[in-house]
Swiss-Prot record:
Example of a GO cellular component annotation carried by this entry: DNA-directed RNA polymerase complex
UniProt protein name: DNA-directed RNA polymerase subunit gamma
Subunit relationships: In cyanobacteria the RNAP catalytic core is composed of 2 alpha, 1 beta, 1 beta', 1 gamma and 1 omega subunit. When a sigma factor is associated with the core the holoenzyme is formed, which can initiate transcription.
Free-text remark on how the cofactor is bound: Binds 1 Mg(2+) ion per subunit.
Main function: DNA-dependent RNA polymerase catalyzes the transcription of DNA into RNA using the four ribonucleoside triphosphates as substrates.
Designated gene of the protein: rpoC1
Taxonomic superkingdom: Bacteria
Amino acid sequence: MTNSNTRTESHFDYVKIKLASPERIREWGQRTLPNGQVVGEVTKPETINYRTLKPEMDGLFCEKIFGPSKDWECHCGKYKRVRHRGIVCERCGVEVTESRVRRHRMGFIKLAAPVSHVWYLKGIPSYVAILLDMPLRDVEQIVYFNCYVVLDPGDHKTLKYKQLLTEDEWLEIEDEIYAEDSEIETEPEVGIGAEALKALLEDLELTEIAEQLREDISGSKGQKRAKLIKRLRVIDNFIATDARPEWMVLDAIPVIPPDLRPMVQLDGGRFATSDLNDLYRRVINRNNRLARLQEILAPEIIVRNEKRMLQEAVDALIDNGRRGRTVVGANNRPLKSLSDIIEGKQGRFRQNLLGKRVDYSGRSVIVVGPKLKMHQCGLPKEMAIELFQPFVIHRLIRQNIVNNIKAAKKLIQRADDEVMQVLQEVIDGHPILLNRAPTLHRLGIQAFEPKLVDGRAIQLHPLVCPAFNADFDGDQMAVHVPLALEAQTEARMLMLASNNILSPATGQPIITPSQDMVLGAYYLTATRQERSKPEFGDRSRTYANLEDVCHAFEEKRITLHDWVWVRFNGAVDDDDEAKEPIKSETLSDGTRVEQWQYRRDRLDEDGALISRYVLTTTGRVVMNRTIIDAVVTR
């Protein structure tokens, strides 16, 4: 970690999450100011003063602990300006520095009694219960002050280590111990609450237990063996991370930086605050009350009740609703605890740390683009101008259309023809990546050549849908622009849709026509027997070439399923080759005309083909024409 002035740059390879020791928690929050004063402990539940609107000292927003609210200004206003950097005000004790330190400086609350960490107690599995080799129900009875636990049986004959005792049972044993004829010399020791739990965890010698468990595992089987392995795994993890089991019981609680749990003033003079402040306030109030009760030597039952309430307050702060009644705020809304902030899709890890937002990307609904080639996609002009804006601006300046970036942006906003022409030049040969979530295999993200289209929907070739598992009922896809030349080359060589015809999982073709395509091909080439077949030479149904048939169809002179005669000198696949022609006639010039069921050939004297007319439907001509256009490069 390197420091330069006030800026801190951290270089690290990974983040490791493990149990923190009480000393480590204090280190997070405790700081020594330049004048030697130690600060960090939050002792008051107050947040801000309602008259001055400044943070209360030693409270949850204390400027002495967390840093000044305003840049280079202390709490009392004695020091203002950057020239006083690093000075600690003699009057208010606030260090003069930047206000952004309030985003990372922590504090801590020193607890008047230990409390158990709810994650390790009530998590699945319960690590506390596994380590102590006790049922979770029994551990909860101890922590929440329902039962005593024997920490040391002493000379008592019936008591055993870790045995649970109710209030009445312990009173009976006490009477027995302090009776005049008692033979017990070493008194049994019992405990209750998180203090007792901490004592039990401190007694654990992890290395010895691990060795013993390995011996027991070798001689056991079935469910007992599985239980032993589970316990050994937890113990091995504790040994590997140099963590102590008693750290699962907290003596101090870290207070996160105030700017991560802000308090904001609304228009009406009211304040909106983070739920964490309410939860911290509950903990501090109960902690202070417990400390006061202990000072005045209050009855044990009152102190015990306050300890239980402190335990519940800390549980709610760490994970509200995990155990007991959920703490609610206004309108009976559950308060968001630390766990709620970090867990789930909207939590700190998945929302802010793992899933980074990507520049040069967009998202839109997909629609079918039947006229596209397989390696092409239709990109809306509105989206393209935004995604390729830096490239367009660069080219506009290079071509001397504008002089600076500001003028280029104004021109782009007007969407002039010049801009569209430059955009077309930019996207020519620049592949884009289309991704459809969830990306379950590598074909879930493929490269395409963009074609500018009107509207706001991305057009996609129907054949690539199976690879994306996409359909056109409202699916959305994300667009990414590869910027580096290497990325563009990789996209073109490896990720282009026309290069990904086979499934990487099975090796079978994944680009297969289905649904509309199969039905369309069938409908196009189907024949209707009820339609009359024209005689050869019928002017309205005889055409010189395939183009003439297509023109007649476009002009609506014929329909898809009408029979037509069309001149076609290519090979014809039919069943007439082995049969005799229906009619054969020799003309005066020596040529011969043969009439077959679906064709009419004119041959010379040597039997060579001069011309051929075939009887087919308009739809089949259109299909044939489309295939020729696709396959033959003209």
